[in-house]
Amino acid sequence: MSLNDDATFWRNARQHLVRYGGTFEPMIIERAKGSFVYDADGRAILDFTSGQMSAVLGHCHPEIVSVIGEYAGKLDHLFSGMLSRPVVDLATRLANITPPGLDRALLLSTGAESNEAAIRMAKLVTGKYEIVGFAQSWHGMTGAAASATYSAGRKGVGPAAVGSFAIPAPFTYRPRFERNGAYDYLAELDYAFDLIDRQSSGNLAAFIAEPILSSGGIIELPDGYMAALKRKCEARGMLLILDEAQTGVGRTGTMFACQRDGVTPDILTLSKTLGAGLPLAAIVTSAAIEERAHELGYLFYTTHVSDPLPAAVGLRVLDVVQRDGLVARANVMGDRLRRGLLDLMERFDCIGDVRGRGLLLGVEIVKDRRTKEPADGLGAKITRECMNLGLSMNIVQLPGMGGVFRIAPPLTVSEDEIDLGLSLLGQAIERAL
């Protein structure tokens, strides 16, 4: 009998856990190390999503374990009006490594919280309240962040915040605007903002965007799009908020994804990867915006704002990423992963597209590669076969597209682990077809 079949465990889970989306895997995870998690039977499962797209250093990295132990023993939590060295040091480090002009940081706990703080700041500083995002976005499950999230969770909970607008994200695999046989995503952006201008009451405060929309199906903003988006914002007195929860801290082959585009947002939000799986988030903005927000009485007082222990973790994460060259490694290992996925694409017609950047890649599963008809159900079947073989994969499927695997192994992943994951994925596809 499998130790995962613990009747008491599953009875208690059914009776006492609130279900918050999706279904639970039918196994009990007992420990994790590096690129693997281990169930109650000791079976190793290769984690190709870094937990919740967060554990960029792998699970239980020894230096992170060490710093947690150190600060749990001497300085864990403080009254929010007190400061500690890890907090000031992390804010200083973030100012030094983010694009020039982003000089002041607020340290928080989760991605939703950081986006909430950013949107609140944008509304206060601009004196306006309308927020625009992408129709395939995910920015969090709290108030303003949920109102700016369009990929899921909008039904059954009453109205979103007044002034919430969405435009389609540019999707090169499934283009909507074509000119002379080519996708004209800048014309699409022009048209989208024309519609926004017609709906706006003149109170456009900010646009919030992910450089690569992860929950939206690994939709990468094409070259030139982010710069054009920034110009749209500037022309309307809007702030540009970039949510780099998943793309930040080296995952895409630059420290921050916006650096590829040479675009500096007005507010940058970080979470997931900043704490490498621990609850740490931040917003980073300019001195001018922070000064104006402070003058206007900006308030974002939370229980765990400026907590020293997670700040110390964030510092150590950045130390390891920079010391071990993990940003460059994301490019090298990402190229290996991409080549392997393209090889699988040659073997299996159900793979319609391979996309993404660095170690954040997407694989879209289709019924017909020529027509790009979505293959409803096949992606979920492949996912189940992956888990049966010992590979943890995550798939998302929005209306109008096939299931998309979001592949995001740790930046510390080895060549052998990349190759193992590719082999298991190939076997899973064979079983599912």
Swiss-Prot record:
InterPro entries reported for this sequence: Aminotrans_3 (IPR005814), Aminotrans_3_PPA_site (IPR049704), PyrdxlP-dep_Trfase (IPR015424), PyrdxlP-dep_Trfase_major (IPR015421), PyrdxlP-dep_Trfase_small (IPR015422)
UniProt KW keywords: Decarboxylase, Lyase, Pyridoxal phosphate
CDD domains linked to this entry: OAT_like (cd00610)
GO molecular function: 2,2-dialkylglycine decarboxylase (pyruvate) activity; pyridoxal phosphate binding; transaminase activity
Obligatory cofactor(s): pyridoxal 5'-phosphate
Modified residues (N6-(pyridoxal phosphate)lysine): 272
Catalytic activity from the UniProt record: 2,2-dialkylglycine + pyruvate + H(+) = dialkyl ketone + L-alanine + CO2
A Pfam family it matches: Aminotran_3
E.C. number(s) listed in UniProt: 4.1.1.64
Cysteine disulfide partners in this protein: none
Lyase as UniProt keyword: yes
Family, similarity comment: Belongs to the class-III pyridoxal-phosphate-dependent aminotransferase family.
Task performed by this protein: The dialkylglycine decarboxylase is of interest because it normally catalyzes both decarboxylation and amino transfer. It may be more properly described as a decarboxylating aminotransferase rather than an aminotransferring decarboxylase.
Assembly with partners or alone: Homotetramer.
Misc remark: The enzyme may have evolved to use the rare dialkylglycines of cosmic origin, or it may be part of a metabolic pathway for breaking down cytotoxic peptides and the constituent amino acids.
Entry protein name: 2,2-dialkylglycine decarboxylase
Organism: Burkholderia cepacia
Gene: dgdA
